[in-house]
């Protein structure tokens, strides 16, 4: 790519204003960072996984404007959650811990000078799910990526010998005990052999037993066995998730957090246990940092309007990448039009790699937020999440990582990642639709105002003013999606039991198997060939519209996505309006890929009716 082709689109206020092209500074011309301590060095001596961004020091031309928002309110941090049979005592409220808040605080009711009359406990009960989850939660640590011994791809998946495939890493996590569910994938796992180098090997799940946990995979479409290659759009649900939802409605259905009756306590237990499961799954420090939302889109909008609406001023900058889903573009465009902030876009190369040097060139003293995907939904590109966070913090910005496509494929630890916000959707990781998670550092969430008002998120309401709870309840106004939050918790426990590293290894092997075979078909152009990818294999076929190819595959029982995948900017960057996008999950097989490849080859040769 010529240097003149590298650019960043700068979006200024106004829906009718066209994007302006802002030249990216040449490499080496960014502010001098040689005297700036790294994020790791700055964090020495502290256990805070979310240190506040530190503005660049030692550079004369860096200006970080003083905050224009009022100081954070000292709000209670956790909503009361009462165990079964206990009625909340409304006559003797415990005193608020910490510093009191003055009468000027806008969150306080008239005439109230401090929070002591409205305090809530600093922690709730230890959640349980009555009669269902008797055992302790899985606590096996997630091994670092690329830290495990390797296995030959021929075993245990019976992959045909292919000269162009390398060995792949398989790092199955240990299966913790204590869970009474009878998971099919744990039955009759094969004995693991040893390689000649005497690396210690670990057990690998039986793919057919895994598939037995997903009832929809027994479906037929057009008389053919269903092959579900549309996993980047949504994943299928294991029977334990379906059963957990049914159990909730049959035995626990109630509103939560308030009431003296048994079912309310059961529902609260289940809901808060799901929050704790989500916390553990992504490595957050506290359950208060987990906010349930409808999905990734709502999570990003929450950050845009609650955090961005408070902190962004005219001329401030938000930096995203060219890889983003529309859900990580449109909210920032709307916010920019309302606040006068400027939206900048980091470019990608022709393979779909994010150009990190050009990304850093966009950062500066006016950068207030970086919002970037960890895995591209359209191309499968895996970005350098930790590097993005480090650079954003170096320039004093908050960082949001879109984990919608990374959460089902990669080990996630937000404490190690260091992002201020991390968002994902439940339906992308074998959970129900309509539920997702916003993770935010506790200090950041505490100083953010609510973005919706209603019940459940308040401590006290008068006709003049309202006093809000702390996170997470402050951001969960009204009756939430209780049942699907419980279902998400069950889905995450299921993935923990399978093993995130097992899943990553198997999916990478599927991608390595499918990629050269698809590329070998005459007329196929692979779209997105980044150095590091997750299990997305977008392509176009010469002489055939993507929708036609999708319909022809459907006739053979194969479900793929055909279109722009809510990522029009990056497809247009590559000269396309649409692609065919097969995407793999850990329940897919090599045999399914063989069927898919044969059908695409027949389409290319004109042997399949695509009308």
UniProtKB/Swiss-Prot annotation:
Its EC number is 2.8.1.7. GO terms for biological process: cysteine metabolic process. Residues 1-208 are annotated as: Cargo-loading domain. One of its GO terms (molecular function) is pyridoxal phosphate binding. Keywords: Encapsulin nanocompartment, Pyridoxal phosphate, Transferase. Its cofactor is pyridoxal 5'-phosphate. It is found in: Encapsulin nanocompartment. Pfam families: Aminotran_5. GO terms for cellular component: encapsulin nanocompartment. It catalyses: (sulfur carrier)-H + L-cysteine = (sulfur carrier)-SH + L-alanine. It is an enzyme of class 2 (transferase). The modification N6-(pyridoxal phosphate)lysine is found at residue 428. Coiled coil: none annotated. InterPro entries: Aminotrans_V_dom, Cys_dSase_SufS, PyrdxlP-dep_Trfase, PyrdxlP-dep_Trfase_major, PyrdxlP-dep_Trfase_small. Cargo protein of a type 2A encapsulin nanocompartment involved in sulfur metabolism. Cysteine desulfurases mobilize the sulfur from L-cysteine to yield L-alanine, an essential step in sulfur metabolism for biosynthesis of a variety of sulfur-containing biomolecules. Belongs to the class-V pyridoxal-phosphate-dependent aminotransferase family. Csd subfamily. There are 1-2 copies of this protein in each type 2A encapsulin shell. This is Probable cysteine desulfurase 1. It comes from Mycobacterium leprae (strain TN). The gene is cyd.
């Amino acid at each position: 790519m010529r240097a003149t082709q590298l650019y960043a689109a700068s979006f200024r206020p106004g829906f009718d204003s066209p994007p302006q092209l802002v030249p990216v500074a040449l490499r080496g011309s960014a502010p001098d960072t040689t005297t700036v301590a790294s994020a790791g060095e700055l964090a020495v001596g502290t256990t805070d996984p979310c240190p506040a961004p530190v503005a660049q020091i030692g550079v004369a031309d860096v200006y970080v404007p003083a905050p224009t928002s009022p100081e954070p309110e000292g709000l209670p941090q956790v909503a009361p959650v009462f165990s079964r049979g206990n009625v909340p005592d409304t006559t003797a409220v415990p005193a608020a811990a910490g510093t009191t808040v003055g009468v000027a605080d806008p969150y306080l009711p008239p005439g109230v000078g401090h929070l002591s009359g409205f305090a809530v406990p600093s922690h709730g009960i230890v959640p349980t799910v009555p009669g269902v989850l008797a055992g302790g939660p899985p606590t096996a640590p997630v091994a670092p990526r690329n830290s495990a011994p390797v296995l030959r791809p021929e075993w245990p998946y019976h992959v045909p010998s292919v000269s162009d495939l390398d060995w792949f890493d398989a790092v199955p996590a240990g299966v913790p005990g204590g869970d009474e569910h009878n998971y099919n994938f744990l039955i009759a796992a094969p004995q693991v052999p040893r390689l000649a180098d005497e690396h210690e090997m670990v057990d690998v799940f039986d793919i057919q037993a895994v598939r037995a946990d997903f009832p929809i995979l027994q479906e037929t479409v057009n008389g053919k066995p269903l092959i579900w290659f549309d996993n980047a759009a949504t994943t299928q649900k294991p029977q334990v998730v379906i059963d957990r939802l049914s159990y909730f409605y049959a035995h626990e259905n109630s509103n939560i957090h308030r009431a003296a009756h048994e079912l309310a306590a059961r529902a609260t237990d289940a809901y808060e246990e799901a929050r704790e499961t989500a916390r553990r799954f992504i490595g957050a420090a506290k359950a208060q940092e987990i906010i349930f939302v409808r999905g990734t889109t709502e999570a990003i909008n929450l950050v845009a309007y609650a955090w961005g609406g408070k902190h962004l001023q005219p001329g401030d900058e938000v930096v995203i990448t060219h890889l983003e889903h529309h859900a990580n573009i449109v909210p920032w465009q709307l916010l920019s039009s309302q606040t006068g902030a400027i939206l900048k876009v980091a470019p990608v190369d022709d393979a779909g790699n994010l150009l990190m040097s050009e990304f850093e060139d966009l950062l500066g003293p006016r950068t207030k937020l970086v919002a970037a995907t960890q895995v591209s939904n359209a191309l499968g590109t895996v970005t350098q999440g930790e590097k993005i966070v480090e650079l954003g913090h170096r320039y004093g910005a908050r960082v949001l990582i879109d984990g919608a496509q990374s959460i089902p494929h990669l080990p996630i630890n937000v404490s190690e990642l260091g992002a201020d916000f991390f968002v994902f959707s439940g339906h992308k990781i074998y959970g129900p639709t309509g539920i997702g998670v916003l993770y935010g550092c506790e200090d950041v969430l505490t100083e953010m105002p609510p973005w919706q008002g209603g019940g459940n998120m308040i401590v006290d309401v008068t006709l003049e003013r309202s006093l809000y709870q702390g996170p997470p309840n402050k951001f969960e106004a009204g009756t939430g999606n209780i049942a699907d939050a419980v279902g998400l918790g069950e889905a995450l426990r299921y993935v923990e039991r399978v093993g995130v590293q097992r899943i990553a290894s198997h999916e990478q092997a599927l991608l390595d198997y499918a990629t050269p075979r698809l590329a070998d078909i005459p007329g196929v152009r692979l779209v997105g060939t980044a150095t590091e990818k997750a299990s997305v294999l977008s392509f176009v076929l010469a002489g055939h519209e993507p929708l036609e190819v999708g319909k022809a595959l459907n006739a053979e029982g194969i479900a793929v996505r055909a279109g722009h995948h809510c990522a029009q900017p990056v497809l247009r960057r590559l000269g396309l309006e649409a692609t065919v996008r097969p995407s793999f999950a850990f329940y897919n097989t090599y045999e399914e890929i063989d069927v898919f490849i044969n059908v695409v080859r027949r389409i290319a040769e004109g042997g399949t009716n695509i009308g």
